[in-house]
Swiss-Prot record:
UniProt region (Disordered), positions on chain: 99-122
Species per Swiss-Prot/TrEMBL record: Ralstonia pickettii (strain 12J)
Family recorded in the similarity comment: Belongs to the bacterial ribosomal protein bS6 family.
Keyword flag Ribonucleoprotein: yes
Upper lineage: Bacteria, Pseudomonadati, Pseudomonadota, Betaproteobacteria, Burkholderiales
Protein name per its UniProtKB record: Small ribosomal subunit protein bS6
PANTHER family hit by this protein: MITOCHONDRIAL 28S RIBOSOMAL PROTEIN S6, SMALL RIBOSOMAL SUBUNIT PROTEIN BS6M
Membrane-spanning ranges: none
NCBIfam families reported in the protein's UniProt record: S6 (TIGR00166)
Primary gene name: rpsF
Length: 122
């Protein structure tokens, strides 16, 4: 089995359905003998360019280990899900379990917000 990193972008109106989508994709991988090494919900972020007249979308990153059949099934699910605006699947050499640079940035932003709120409260 090979390791893959999958990033998909979900329509912002469907953001509340993202946890269910993640669970469905995780169950697809695990039911066929694969493993999910990392799941990151990056949240709503600004798009680099407009997609379907949208400026923001919900980003999700998955690091998985699976076979070709499972990957083909996932790709089919992404293509025919109207809520998924774009997806990218990249083969990696090893399993990535550490937080991605994007998650480190999100954590840093949240820490700044928390510090600002405690400063205002004081």
């Amino acid at each position: 089995m090979r390791h893959y990193e999958i990033v998909f972008i979900v329509h912002p109106d469907q953001s509340e359905q993202v946890p269910a989508m993640i669970e469905r994709y995780k169950s697809t991988v695990t039911s066929q003998g694969g493993q999910v090494h990392r799941v990151e919900d990056w949240g709503r972020r600004q798009l680099a360019y407009m997609i379907q007249k949208l400026a923001k979308a919900h980003y999700v990153c998955l690091n998985i280990e699976c076979g070709k059949e499972t990957l083909a099934e996932l790709e089919h699910a992404f293509k025919f899900n109207d809520a998924v605006l774009r997806h990218l699947i990249v083969q990696t050499k090893k399993a990535e379990t550490a937080p991605s640079p994007m998650m480190k940035e999100v954590a840093r932003e949240e820490a700044k917000k928390a510090a600002a709120q405690t400063e205002q409260a004081a």
